[in-house]
Amino acid sequence: MPRITSVKPQKRKERFNIFLDGKFAFGVDENILVKNHLKVGQILTGDQIEKLIKETILGKLLDQALRFLSYRPRSQKEVTIYLTQKIAKRENIKFREAKESPLIGAVVAKLKRYNYLDDHEFAKWLVNLRIKSASRGLSLIKWELIQKGVDRDIIESILSIHPNQTLIAKKAIEKKLKRWQGLSELDLKKKVYAYLASRGFDFETIKEVFAFLIKRR
């Protein structure tokens, strides 16, 4: 069975190269080195080597996922796709093959356990962001959440606390009104209906907003 003949630090902090029988075998993080008491002279079985390599890859994927999440909140689907792409590139395999890796589920489970990944919190964040900064209607926001893999029950529960679409639609249209000042009522109606529909507002909300604009003219 292979024997550890050398343990050398890498240029990267807290990483070490493990040499078996005089040849480089694999790299490990410091925590894995310490946890498994790896030292020169130690004999490793094939199963132990495989476990150490998997543990190291899992740790690296977890670090990459945490960096990915540090830029902004993500849905579970977004993180799963990201991890799949990383595995596909690392192992030089197709995306659909990488999707089957058990490492993805293991990383996602760890992220959820420590509350780094929560689709309910992600949905709340995205809804508030889209309403405040982009003035989008609920149907467009709902579509975006579905695309990001958020469960429909979560989507409905989050959207149900944002019932007043009229105020949001009025805010969205205000930016356009100066440009449309000289339009006839019919042309204004076409512009308002088309714009608000493209922002994801429903027909009744658009109708109410247009009536408000005409009354204010």
Regions from the language model: what does each represent?
Residues 1-217:
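An alpha-helical, amphipathic repeat domain used for nucleic-acid recognition
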